Each structure stands twice: as C-alpha cells, then as structure tokens.
A protein has these predicted regions:
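Bacterial N-terminal signal peptides that target proteins for export
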Residues: 1-8
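Cleavable N-terminal signal peptides
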Residues: 8-9, 19
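Transmembrane beta-barrel domains of Gram-negative outer membranes and organellar outer membranes
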Residues: 21-283
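Sec/Tat signal peptide C-region and signal peptidase I cleavage site
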Residues: 15-21
Length: 283
C-alpha cells in the first residue's frame, strides 16, 4: 500500500473530529482562511444510492468510509488542504456497457478514493457590502483505478473564486471556477467545465444550524468520464462539547449523480503551532 494511504488512515484514526468554522456537510468551500497554526480536521461517512460509473458500466449503492480532510492555516493569507476517502465500496446492482472492464468476481468492488491537494489564498476580507473573497487551486490525483471500476485514472485540476457574506446571523457561501479534466477515452483530449456552488448556513439555536446547497459542474454534453454533475444537500450542524456533528440528505440532479443519500460526519479544530514573532533588529 502506498505510503500516503497509511498517512491518511492514521490521520482519520488519530485526529478527533469537528469545529465551528468548517462547513461540513456542505461541499461549497468557505472563503475564510484559518488563522496561522490552526488545524481543522473532519471525518465522515456517506451512503449513496444508485451511483453510476460510465467507464465501467457499474451501478449500485455506494458507501464511502472515511471521507476525510485536513486544513492548515499556514499564514495570514494562505491555507493548505488535503482530502481523500479511505475506502469506497460499491454494492453492484446493474452492469451496463463498459469502456474499461472492471476486474471483480462478485457483486462488490472497492478502492481508495482520489487524493486532493489544495491551496486557498485570501484576496480581501468581508467589509460593508463587500463579501470576503478567496482564490483556491486544487489537484486531484488518480488513486482509484480502472480495475475496481471506480476510477478514471486521470489527474484533474480545479481553480475557483470563493465568496462569503453574512446577512444578519446567516452566512451565504458561493464559488465559481473551472476544472481541467483529461479524457479517459480520448488521448490528448480534455474537458473544461464550469464549477459552481451556492450554500446557506442559518442558525436556529445557539448550537444548531440549518444548512443547504446546490453544487456541481457543467460542461459540454456526452463526454464519457467527464459527465456533468450536480447535487443538492440539506441538513443540520450541531455542537456537543466543542465537537461539531453534521447530518444531511443528498439528492442527485443528473444521470451520473446518486439518486439519493445520507452523509454524517464531524469536525474538530485546534491550535497546532504558534506563529513565530519576527525578530526586531535595533541599530
């Protein structure tokens, strides 16, 4: 097993889960940057029904075990992110025409999820009518393989502008950008879809929020392996003893999204290191 996978598993087991500034179960990113030395870790499980894979022709109920991410504030204007899935398990219910035959003997297949590395840079803070704005760049590494029927074997790149605005006690999040997706079936061809997300976080109690979003990507139609995707997520966030838990329902809006699903998880934030003061030279 590659070394990074053992590291990700160790993170998921050792790091406790949940904090107020992270926006799980939403996938629309927050424009706010963690303060220097702050670390935020989250961990969750997803149960998704009727998930389709165009390259392998597989369809079934997908269980995602260990949907995890680590965010680290590395400076006043920068944040580093790493995320992945410890194990994707698909209970196969249907098999359609395939482009790459999956190598499985039964009705279940599994694989590690793709690893995503990202950097978020703060451009401006929220002030008056102006929202907070950040820029994010991320790369998704192809760890899930064709043999399992769950991967594309393509490195993908993402860039987006992130926005955040408070309205009374509520928060509005939005992002817009584009992706560069290599074609798994046509050598040298790529798709550059628009990526988007808009979300709301509405407090209804001191320790309870309602959350909702629509998020996805849209590009040229009929691109095998690079299909358009869009999801709606609605749910709650709640706190117990400094740990924030989340629960949400998922509804897919395209043919290659899950028909429905449930996600649960938690997030924890802590101070990992202090910013060293700059030395002062007296002449």
């Amino acid at each position: 097993m590659p070394k990074w996978r053992w590291i990700l598993i160790a993170i998921c087991v050792v790091v406790p889960a949940a904090a107020r500034a992270q926006q799980r179960p939403l996938r629309t990113d927050d424009a706010e940057i963690l303060k220097t030395g702050r670390v935020r870790a989250d961990f969750g499980i997803e149960f998704l029904q009727k998930q389709r894979y165009s390259l392998s022709g597989l369809q079934g109920d997908l269980t995602r075990l260990g949907v995890a991410s680590i965010h680290v504030g590395v400076g006043e204007y920068a944040e580093f992110q790493i995320s992945g899935v410890v194990q994707d398990v698909l209970a196969v219910s249907e098999r359609d025409e395939w482009y790459f035959p999956p190598k499985l003997s039964g009705n279940t297949t599994s694989d590690f999820g793709d690893l995503v590395l990202g950097t978020k840079l703060k451009l401006v803070g929220e002030q008056g009518c102006r929202p907070a704005i950040s820029f994010k760049f991320a790369v998704e590494l192809p760890n899930a393989k064709h043999d399992s029927g769950l991967g594309t074997d393509q490195t993908e790149f993402y860039s987006s502008l992130l926005f955040k605005k408070h309205w009374r006690r509520s928060q509005i999040l939005a992002d817009v950008g584009f992706a560069i997706l290599g074609s798994p079936v046509s050598l040298g061809r790529q798709t550059d879809p628009l990526t988007y997300g808009i979300a709301a976080i509405i407090p209804i109690h001191r320790s309870l929020n309602l959350v909702g979003e629509i998020q996805g990507r849209h590009g040229p139609p009929r691109r095998v392996g690079n299909e358009n995707k869009s999801q709606i997520r609605t749910g709650i966030q709640f706190w117990t003893q400094g740990i924030r838990w989340d629960l949400a329902g998922v509804a897919g809006l395209t043919h290659y999204d899950p028909k429905s699903g449930i996600v649960v998880g938690a997030t924890y934030e802590f101070q990992a290191f202090q910013r060293s003061p700059s030395p002062v030279t007296i002449k």
